[in-house]
Amino acid sequence: MKTAWLGTFAASALLVAGYAQADADLAKKNNCIACHQVETKVVGPALKDIAAKYADKDDAATYLAGKIKGGSSGVWGQIPMPPNVNVSDADAKALADWILTLK
């Protein structure tokens, strides 16, 4: 019984790690990392800071996906985030969901 539980736990951990890596790869693929890093402000805010700012917002993933696709200005300073028209709706949602998991 203990072995089965440990196996399930290990499989779950690998699944979560794979999900996190897949969306980090998605951020690289869509060139998000040119302006954003997980821990550090570059041109745009650190992704962990974005996650913290919107952690309690009910529709945070939808809101962030819209910002990823449509861009924004004045939210995090003077440098605007350009729209990312080549990012699919599904990828924008996956990126937003991933960002919100960062602590």
UniProtKB/Swiss-Prot annotation:
Superkingdom of origin: Bacteria
One GO MF term attached to the UniProt entry: electron transfer activity
Post-translational modification: Binds 1 heme c group covalently per subunit.
PROSITE patterns referenced in this protein's UniProt entry, alphabetically: CYTC
Signal peptide: 1-22
Localization annotation: Periplasm
InterPro entries: Cyt_c-like_dom (IPR009056), Cyt_c-like_dom_sf (IPR036909), Cyt_c_ID (IPR002324)
Pfam family for this entry, one: Cytochrom_C
Subunit structure: Monomer.
The protein's role, per its UniProt record: Monoheme c-type cytochrome. Probable electron donor to membrane cytochrome oxidase and to periplasmic nitrite reductase.
Protein name per Swiss-Prot or TrEMBL: Cytochrome c-552
Source organism: Nitrosomonas europaea (strain ATCC 19718 / CIP 103999 / KCTC 2705 / NBRC 14298)
Protein's gene: cyt
